[in-house]
């Protein structure tokens, strides 16, 4: 059984780690920058341990990267690199209107998401659900890694001319703006901003987090909807008024409609 030192936190890391733990011996899980000194100690004690990373959130120092040469630390990045380098590739793909979602396994280098690529896959027919997309991409990348540890192919360099970048999500992004956005854009923001920064809209003077929604079909009578700039409607299925518990649209109307 191959030994692994795993770097990561958040949903992408959780889904990837679940796959890796079934097939490998995880000798240490680094979750924060403060764990990097312990990584150096564990790696010296386990020189044959592979490094795998998924959504660690901080740059790995050169003194840590060097310990894993020549194989390097394998980074599961949820995009078709060099597209969507950076902190929010899945959310950026959702917001851009992409219908397919990709994952790359690359060798970690000092430059952000710029290392040579071992493997890429593109998944279609995924539900427009952020959790499902995270899970599918993390598992696809992790499964390839556990099946190829010890016999990795030669990685291929990225084409720097095709690189695009995405930044961190900010709390202010959660405020929906359907007065200027189409129903499609509003819906994609609701999907992309689940978890953080949380999509918000005000009904009857009550600010709410929108948890589940869909684009209303022609002729559909929605219980609760958000009117958008193109004349379309986003039907809200589940929501959470600030400071209150989650409820469906009908329950919200019964309690808050004036």
Pin down the residues of each PLM region.
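Donor/substrate-binding cores of folate-linked one-carbon enzymes
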Residues: 3-5, 10-12, 21, 56-166
